[in-house]
């Protein structure tokens, strides 16, 4: 038996029941823990899909770490109820993949609340959405802006991280001064873009990287090593099986579809065994 009180499991086993307890016979069925959706756009692309309510991509600049997905979440999105019926009790809301650096993601509990603050999962760290490949170069190349190529993508990431390191060094230099010295000069001005990137460099914000092709994942790891941050997971990762050992060696997870691919060029080279290959890489040290 499983005892639930106030929507939470409070006991499992042989449980004496109160006479007023509601009993549901689920013999022959599966009971699982709540499902965590690790890549969601619920709330920022709510149903019905209207342009006036589509707030997941700030596609005005390829680098927008200053925007936060939680500031777009519509807490009345009917998709939340449908997801709950499917067993999803927690979900990670990310900005879309139009930008090289798309903004902060947030982890929410699937509970009713008028405010997004009331839905936040306690203690969950912020994340940062990055995207490589077709989407950024298509969105901005189509506007005759940089990036329009994959090498333009990489240049954009590197410029952003160089600026972040400069800002981080200024903050460290100021904090290293004595109290007397601090009184004689101003602290570095707040910069919303660079604050988020420095949060990544300081290990407080976790990178979630939209990426399909194997060689591009390897390039993103090269950039991470150059600037001293860690990629937590590659999302979609259609070709992760090609670099499974590299991902395992670097402690990087892959968040993948089990059976969906082929909907655009970079999503063609998939194998059914993708998730299994990544999970079992290097003697079972992979993460999928």
Spans of features found by a protein language model:
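Active-site environment of divalent metal-dependent phosphoester hydrolases
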Residues: 42-45, 75, 98-102, 214-218, ...
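Solvent-exposed loop/turn segments at secondary-structure junctions
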Residues: 10, 30-31, 40-43, 97-99, ...
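Generic beta-strand/beta-sheet core signal
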Residues: 5, 94, 210-212, 234-237, ...
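Polyanionic/metal-chelating signatures
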Residues: 79, 84-233
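Histidine-rich, glycine-flanked metal-binding segment
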Residues: 1-32
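His/Asp/Glu-enriched, well-ordered alpha-helical/loop segment
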Residues: 47-48, 54-67, 206, 245-288
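Metal-associated gating/positioning segment near the N- to mid-region
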Residues: 26-95, 99-100
